[in-house]
Swiss-Prot record:
Parts forming coiled coils: none
Record GO biological process: division septum assembly; FtsZ-dependent cytokinesis
Protein keywords: Cell cycle, Cell division, Cytoplasm, Septation
TM region positions: none
Alphabetical list of Pfam families matching this protein: ZapD (PF07072)
A single Gene Ontology CC term: cytoplasm
Keyword Cytoplasm: yes
Principal place of residence: cytoplasm
The name this protein goes by in its record: Cell division protein ZapD
Protein family (similarity comment): Belongs to the ZapD family.
Length: 246
């Protein structure tokens, strides 16, 4: 059975984490510049990420969340039935990532100070603003050898490596707390309680032709399925898998 996957954050902080994760993934995929338009995705993702860095103190929030995870896993030390070797390995990884995060510069500082990026950032988001007469510096850069452009991209991405490593680890461990269970949305609607949850993950069979509209917070949520073709609320029963991740 073919399914499509959905994730939904249950608090604003996790919503931002997922957005930054998506931007980092887009930058990574586009950094090969294998065709003539990948630079659009790369720079747009980079500048969107800088906007987020300027709006919130992402470093301090992520550091607090990693410390909370670390304390949770430390409480499992010497607990019978827990693989202590695996647990100690995980704690070592968490400690290393957290240490690198704390010693890193403020996210985006080097990128904001980069002369080339500063020169193109303001006009890049104008409608059609990447034309050569709007952004001559970008036009010149695009004609540099591919290996030079890829090297520049890697250097820019390396400035946020501590963020990337910490965010990937926090989201990985958070997702692993949830296990998919079969659920039924009666007449296309499902609601439930969730104790201090961060993320909902859904696997929905494509055959239903629906997508979810989700509302809620860390303690309670509701899912309404929408028919893709009509745009109306679905009234049939929908069997799907749900994981609640804390």
């Amino acid at each position: 059975m073919t399914t499509h996957q959905f994730e939904h954050p249950l608090n604003e902080k996790t919503r931002i984490y997922l957005r930054v994760e998506a931007l980092l993934n887009q930058m990574e995929r586009a950094s090969t510049f294998s065709d003539g338009i990948q630079h659009q995705l790369f720079f747009r993702s980079l500048f969107d990420m800088l906007e987020i860095f300027e709006q919130i103190q992402l470093k301090s929030e992520l550091a607090k969340d990693m410390e909370k995870q670390r304390l949770t896993y430390r409480s499992w030390l010497h607990v019978e039935g827990v693989d202590q070797e695996m647990l100690n390995s995980l704690l070592t990884e968490v400690d290393e990532v957290h240490r690198d995060l704390m010693s890193a510069e403020r996210f985006g500082q080097s990128l904001k100070e980069d002369r080339f990026l500063s020169a193109i950032r303001q006009r890049f988001n104008l409608p059609g603003g990447s034309c050569c007469f709007d952004l001559p510096a970008l036009h010149y850069w695009l004609h540099l050898p591919l290996d030079r452009k890829m090297r520049d991209a890697q250097q820019w991405m390396q400035t946020v490596t501590p963020l990337s490593n910490a965010l990937k680890l926090w989201l990985k461990l958070t997702r692993e707390t949830g296990h998919y269970r079969s659920r039924m949305a009666s007449n296309g609607f499902y609601q439930s309680d969730a104790e201090d949850a961060n993320i909902l993950r859904l696997a929905i069979p494509l055959e239903y032709g629906v997508y979810p509209m989700i509302s809620g917070h860390k303690n309670r949520f509701a899912i309404k399925f929408i028919d893709f073709h009509s745009g109306q609320a679905c009234t049939q029963d929908i069997a799907f898998d749900l994981a609640v991740c804390c």
